Amino acid sequence: KPGFYSIQGNHEQMLCAALRDGDALAEYCWVRNGGNWFYELPKAEQQQIRDHWLPKLEQLPLVIDLYTVDNVHVGICHADPVFNDWQELLTALKEYKAKKRDDLIEKLVWSRERISLANKTDLLSEAYRIKGIDWCVMGHTPIRPTPYRKGNCLWLDSGAVFPGGYLSVLEAGKDLHCHQASA
C-alpha cells in the first residue's frame, strides 16, 4: 500500500537463501531462526510460496531513502547503516562489487555494533548522528524501551516475536510518532 514500506532484513535473506538455493546450511539457519513453519506446510503451499513470494522478497530494497510530506529525510535500514554518512552508504551500495558488497550487505542486515555501542556509552547523542539525513530508522535488535533514540538514530524493534513483545509502527511526518500494539 502507498505509505507503507518494507525492507529486506536478515530473516528475508535467510528465507531466500533456503528456498532459492536449497542449501542445507541455509535451510538449517532459517529453521533455527523461525523458518520451521514453512516445512510444516503442504508441498503445494510450499511451491506456491516459492513461486509467488520468493521473487517479491528478493526484490525488497536493502535501504529506503524517503522524504515525508513535511520534507523530513528518513533513511530506513534493517540493522545498521554501517557508515556515519547516509550518502556514503547509498554510494557504496551502488559501487561496491562482489565480496566487498556482500560484506557491506551482511553488516547492513546483521550488525548490532551501533546499538551495542549506544547502550554501553554515555557519549553525547551527536556522536551517533548519521550525516545527510534527519532520521535513520532501524530494527533487528529487540530493545526496551522502544523506540530507543540516540542522536538521529531510532531503533524500533520491540520484540513482537517474543512473549510480552509488541509491534511498533512509525508514522513519519514533521515529527516521528511510534504506535505500538501487543503482538
What are these regions (language model features)?
Residues 22-25, 92-95, 153-156:
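Glycine-rich, phosphate-binding/catalytic loops in enzymes
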Residues 8, 182-183:
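A generic structural motif
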Residues 9-10, 38, 57, 78, ...:
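Divalent metal-coordination and catalytic microenvironments
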